[in-house]
Amino acid sequence: MSAVPGPVYGLEVPPGEILIPAAMEFPASSLSVAGASFATPLVLPAGDLNSNQKILQFRITMAAVDPTEEPEADGEGNIPTVPRSTLRLVKRALPGLEDEDDEIDDEYMKALLAGSDDEEDSDEEANGGPSDPAKAKKQRQAAAIKKLLESAQEESDEEMEDAKPNGKAKGKAKATEESDDDEDEDSDDDSEEGADLENFVICTLDTERNYQQPLDITVNHGEKVFFVVTGSHTIYLTGNYIMDDDEDDEDSEDEDEYDLSPDELEYGLEGDDSDASDDLDGLEDPRVEEIDTDEEEAPKLVAANKGKNKRAAEEAAGLDELITKEDAKLSKKQQKKLKNNKGEAVAAEEKKDAKKVQFAKNLEQGPTGSTTEKPKQAKDSKPATGVKVVQGVTVDDRTVGNGRTVKSGDTVGVRYIGKLQNGKQFDANKKGKPFSFKAGKGQVIKGWDIGVIGMAIGGERRLTIPAHLAYGSRGLPGIPANSTLIFDVKLLEIK
């Protein structure tokens, strides 16, 4: 799975305490519940997605007001001397909870927003009264949303009193209106549910000096997030959808070699395309003999490297090995190699895979060149690995690649595994389309912009990135604030 930038995201948040859902699953109309208005964002056209893509999240990068727009008066009909608007974000305190009892299901959320439950539906429910624990919990959640909105308003107590439910969201609000005594009894529960909601001020914009504000807010698909604006002007949010591209690039030999185990690679080469398959049908025995030869020579190369460089044999763990260790489909023969040769067996297998790909490619050209070039390349290759600190990022070269190196402005494609210092993995790109970005241009965290400079194709690095060069004090889902991050990165291509 790999994340790629998608179409432009846009959302209009009008003033007047209107609660705007940022997600994409809600009905395409402006609705209201518990005295608070709701509206939906722009719906992504189906034509913008291909069959292999789905929305993972969206990233909001700009908030702006139109200074030429006529300001809206407040509830008393007054227009401030300096028109301004404040943007707030309302969200669940713990997004993505797995416990079904602690989250509002999608059907209920739609019903809550649409307010379309009629009295007949309410009468048909088996346990339709406040005594039903599930329904009472949902009523408390609706009341908590209402209370949060009322606390954000700067209107009088009488105006807030007018904002009580008035027949909207009938199926869920009707039981709340039945008895004021019931509301008093559940006040403690309402406060407890209200603790699940958080209200954050994002920015305040005016029409004289601060027309716009750059942001960097990423909202996961399905996360319950809303925006509210108080003031005189509409605030416009823009950004990009982030898509999941599961399309496998069958034409890339490097990707196939990287993703598959030796047995899977051999099978894939036999059936990858019709022309190659036809050529290999008559050469099955020589092909098997060549693979056996590689397996016999590989331990010799490992032994030679082990004698020259103990550090590479004892502690260097390449990205290929990390991915292989996580693969539950390893054969017994591969597991035996990993056990006897520690990390080096993986390097030997990688060279064997490369040999097989090269051999299959050269079958069409004839039996010249391939058998003599590979040992020479292995003999001349002398990786200069080591640990150094570059602008605060600790760079540990595990494998040095070949060819030209990455410079600022190059577009690169990489595989990576990201972990916290306690070893917990929070992100990875191990198969499918490589993760691509432009180095040194701010498209990724600062530590990556620094850490990939100087890598060559095929090279592997471990980047230890301090918090101030990663996500700082804000953190992300799965990444606590002020976390030092460790990335194992392999460079596949430079464009």
UniProtKB/Swiss-Prot annotation:
The gene is FPR4. Its main location: nucleus. Binds to histones H3 and H4. Residues 115-198, 243-312, 333-385 are annotated as: Disordered. InterPro entries: NPL (IPR041232), PPIase_dom_sf (IPR046357), PPIase_FKBP_dom (IPR001179), PPIase_Fpr3/Fpr4-like (IPR023566). It catalyses: [protein]-peptidylproline (omega=180) = [protein]-peptidylproline (omega=0). This is FK506-binding protein 4. It comes from Gibberella zeae (strain ATCC MYA-4620 / CBS 123657 / FGSC 9075 / NRRL 31084 / PH-1). Keywords: Chaperone, Isomerase, Nucleus, Rotamase.
